[in-house]
Swiss-Prot record:
Gene3D superfamilies: 3.30.70.330
Protein family according to the UniProt entry: Belongs to the eukaryotic ribosomal protein eS24 family.
A GO-annotated cellular component: ribosome
Gene this protein is translated from: rps24e
Annotated signal peptide: none
Gene Ontology biological process terms in this record: translation
Protein name: Small ribosomal subunit protein eS24
GO molecular function terms listed in the Swiss-Prot or TrEMBL record: structural constituent of ribosome
Keywords linked to the UniProt accession: Ribonucleoprotein, Ribosomal protein
Length: 113
């Protein structure tokens, strides 16, 4: 990749793809991005997942945000993302807590009130 590709994450944030690697053995794309959100909070996992899925052309449920690192006071975050080709491959390699993180599913505590 000779030129960094730009992705619009939200109204106040955009990202640059630093590294995009296709892991054909596992059947996933491994992406490292740098998100610029100066003067605003770190974008949510849902916003980043939505932006990456439209950029890659994959379903949102096949995108897993492995981690987001933001330096204190900095308006720049680094994120590591995996995009899988199939749901069953995703379930073999990614822990459930990462797959579910950032989703708006009700937990047992919220349901019982």
């Amino acid at each position: 990749m000779s030129q960094a590709q730009q992705i619009k994450v939200s109204d106040k944030a955009e990202a640059l793809v630093e590294n995009l690697k296709e892991n054909k053995v596992i059947g996933r794309k491994e992406i490292k991005i740098k998100v610029y959100h100066i003067g605003s909070p770190t974008p949510s996992r849902a916003d980043i997942r939505k932006a990456i899925s439209s950029f890659i052309g994959a379903k949102e449920d096949l995108v897993v945000i492995r981690k987001i690192n933001t330096g204190y006071g900095a308006g720049i975050s680094e994120a590591t993302i995996h995009v899988y080709s199939e749901k069953d491959v995703l379930s073999k390699f990614e822990p459930a807590h990462l797959v579910n993180r950032g989703n708006k599913a009700k937990t047992q505590g919220e349901a019982s009130g």
